């Protein structure tokens, strides 16, 4: 079943790669499905912080 997702995360059947805050923000993603999970969706402008939170890219700390 669907696990409970954290703030800003979305349950996704076909997860791609998440994007982290920081210099690797523009790393291209492989177009493959990973296992279903809670995704911090880059398509919605979200980024994963180093401590695992999912926040809007505009709130990323300056690097």
UniProtKB/Swiss-Prot annotation:
Reactive bond (site feature) positions: 31-32
Location within or outside the cell: Secreted
Residues of the TIL domain: 5-60
InterPro entries: Ser_inhib-like_sf (IPR036084), TIL_dom (IPR002919)
GO cellular component terms, A-Z: extracellular region
Principal cellular location given in the protein's record: secreted
Listed CDD domains: TIL
Membrane-traversing stretches: none
SUPFAM superfamilies in UniProt: Serine protease inhibitors
Molecular functions (GO terms): serine-type endopeptidase inhibitor activity
Functional description taken from the UniProt entry: Defends the organism against the host's proteinases.
Protein family (similarity comment): Belongs to the serine protease inhibitor-like (TIL domain-containing) family.
Listed name of the protein: Chymotrypsin/elastase isoinhibitor 1
Native source species: Ascaris suum (Pig roundworm)
